[in-house]
Amino acid sequence: MDSCEVTKTRIPFKERPDWADVKPVPQDDGPCPVVPIAYTEDFSETMDYFRAIYVADERSTRALQLTGEAIQLNPGNYTVWQFRRVVLEALGVDLREELKFVDRIAGENTKNYQIWHHRRWLAEKLGADAVTNELEFTKKIFSQDAKNYHAWSHRQWVLQALGGWEDELAYCQQLLEDDIYNNSAWNQRYFVVTRSPLLGGLVAMRELEVNYTVQAIRASPENESPWRYLRGLYKNDTQSLVQDSQVASVLWDVLTSQNSHVHALRFLLDLLCHDLEPSQELKSAVDVLTPQSCSPDLALTKKICSILEHADPMRVKYWNWRKSMVRVQLLQSQNAERLANLSVQE
């Protein structure tokens, strides 16, 4: 029997000659279990025999086969997976064959922690030889579930631990061409830009990435992901963000278009709180969107909050609070900037 295949014609362990010497160890639920779990007969017997070989620490071929059957019945049993690793090492099994076993189990259990942990263990043992296979495996998972956290976490681990960075930015590009709203792909793109040893780091990549992101914003200004990505490109360097002419340009483009203005207004508000000196064009764009009930003399930041109260009604209380805190936020930003300058001078 295949180690991961439990069929309707399954032969009970008690009827298998090669298991005749093993005395099964039943589960001990105590003398008076309150709500005992109604296990199937096959599951109970399999686990009874597993407990027997586990207690005996039997590291044999039949033990490996048994763990395969137990995992098929319950892929989430971490004790079975752990013992399987012990047996695999003891037997010196070809781990590439073990990956095939995991592939079959993972097909219907793509969010199972134990399976991903076991796969990482295998990849770590196989080293650089596993890179291509693991990257392709995660691609297969993404074709079914583009936001599978386990697969993304595994892919990032593979890149950092084993390599394979060469085509990763191009892969992110392809994912975003397929779906510009794929926030997981945006996250991976940022991971690659900031972590890849081949690209030179965030500062070196910033201009190219800003160009790409600005184009994405112009194409879909209602998409929050590129706006967040743009912020990330200036992490710990807010002044460069404030001074970037491309940013001001895309803000004006969006605010004067017929598209959703919410993300652009939020972005502009934050820039103003970090001492952005807005152009007359930006001021005029905001004035056009400002409700008639607002005073013409109202500060630009408060005008933006008033617009957002109408454009983003779900957060109306938040924008009302931001309006009341604009002055405080501006002072905090200015104080932080002064402290940063003093630190540089020292």
UniProtKB/Swiss-Prot annotation:
Q: What class of enzyme is it?
A: transferase
Under Gene Ontology molecular function, one entry of this record is:
CAAX-protein geranylgeranyltransferase activity
EC numbers for this chain: 2.5.1.58, 2.5.1.59
Q: Which is one Pfam family of this protein?
A: PPTA
- One of the GO biological process terms: peptide pheromone maturation
Its biological purpose: Essential subunit of both the farnesyltransferase and the geranylgeranyltransferase complex. Contributes to the transfer of a farnesyl or geranylgeranyl moiety from farnesyl or geranylgeranyl diphosphate to a cysteine at the fourth position from the C-terminus of several proteins having the C-terminal sequence Cys-aliphatic-aliphatic-X.
How is this protein named in the record? Protein farnesyltransferase/geranylgeranyltransferase type-1 subunit alpha
**What species is this protein from?**
Solanum lycopersicum (Tomato)
Q: What is the lineage of its organism?
A: Eukaryota, Viridiplantae, Streptophyta, Embryophyta, Tracheophyta
